[in-house]
């Protein structure tokens, strides 16, 4: 069964919009876990636009599943991860003015810096994933520098303007998943996935986990967090059963 990591960043976005103490990401994590979430993902950005340091600490203390901490491979972030020791860290590219992560890491062009970051996190007992575009060269480089997991960026698939373009992007994701498996990497995927487009991705070969945030939080506004998570889990189960 494919695992579901629920990204709760936008619970914090709503809180920070008014500078209030609510809604609390910890409450959202509890609800997601009750509904079957297999992990909780948070992106601690360097500008602290949504998730705060306190949130990560409290989630570490209270989550019943595991924490997947998304972060830039910067010295301040690495130092925090070494202190907090979340079960998983996903290294992502970060631009201060972007609304959301716009693409995957350039592992090929930043091989030495990322290799050092991966080694430091491994030494702290943290499983490390790299957020990469479904590019065969980038995936091979991720394996070469010691990453355990690649999370494939599904944004181009999600944002494809036509079905033909979406099919092309899906084919590339299939090739990339196969390449990752050949390199001994665990395959995760995420970004831009919704209730309408998740099922083809859930059928990717060797896929172990999906990380989904915005769509689930948006749905939760209408039906509640537990119902939103259960609905996504159902779609994932059905996708795996249907060839």
From Swiss-Prot:
InterPro entries hit by this protein: Aldolase_TIM (IPR013785), PyrdxlP_synth_PdxJ (IPR004569), Pyridoxine-5'_phos_synth (IPR036130)
Pfam families: PdxJ (PF03740)
Amino acids binding 3-amino-2-oxopropyl phosphate: 7, 18, 192, 213-214
Compartments reported by the entry: Cytoplasm
Keyword line: Cytoplasm, Pyridoxine biosynthesis, Transferase
Catalysed reaction, written as an equation: 3-amino-2-oxopropyl phosphate + 1-deoxy-D-xylulose 5-phosphate = pyridoxine 5'-phosphate + phosphate + 2 H2O + H(+)
EC number of the protein: 2.6.99.2
Family designation: Belongs to the PNP synthase family.
Subunit structure: Homooctamer; tetramer of dimers.
Record's protein name: Pyridoxine 5'-phosphate synthase
Native source organism of the sequence: Magnetococcus marinus (strain ATCC BAA-1437 / JCM 17883 / MC-1)
């Amino acid at each position: 069964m494919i695992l579901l990591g629920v990204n709760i960043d936008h619970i914090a976005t709503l809180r920070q919009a008014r500078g209030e103490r609510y809604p609390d990401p910890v409450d959202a994590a509890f609800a997601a876990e009750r509904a079957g979430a297999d992990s909780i993902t948070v992106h601690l950005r360097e500008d602290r636009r949504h998730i705060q340091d306190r949130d990560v600490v409290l989630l570490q203390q209270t989550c019943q599943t595991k924490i997947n901490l998304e972060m830039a491979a910067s010295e301040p972030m690495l130092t925090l991860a070494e202190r907090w020791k979340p079960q998983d860290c996903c290294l992502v590219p970060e631009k201060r003015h972007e609304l959301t992560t716009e693409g995957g890491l350039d592992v090929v062009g930043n091989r030495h810096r990322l290799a050092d970051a991966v080694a430091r996190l491994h030494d702290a007992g943290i499983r490390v994933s790299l957020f990469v575009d479904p590019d065969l060269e980038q995936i091979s480089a991720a394996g070469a520098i010691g990453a355990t997991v690649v999370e494939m960026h599904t944004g181009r698939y999600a944002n494809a303007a036509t079905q033909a373009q979406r099919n092309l992007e899906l084919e590339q994701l299939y090739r990339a998943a196969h390449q990752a498996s050949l390199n001994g990497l665990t395959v995760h995927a995420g970004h831009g996935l919704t209730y309408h487009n998740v099922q083809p991705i859930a059928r990717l070969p060797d896929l172990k986990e999906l990380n989904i945030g915005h769509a689930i939080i948006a749905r939760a506004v209408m039906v509640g967090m537990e119902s939103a998570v259960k609905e996504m889990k159902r779609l994932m189960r059905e996708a795996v059963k249907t060839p």
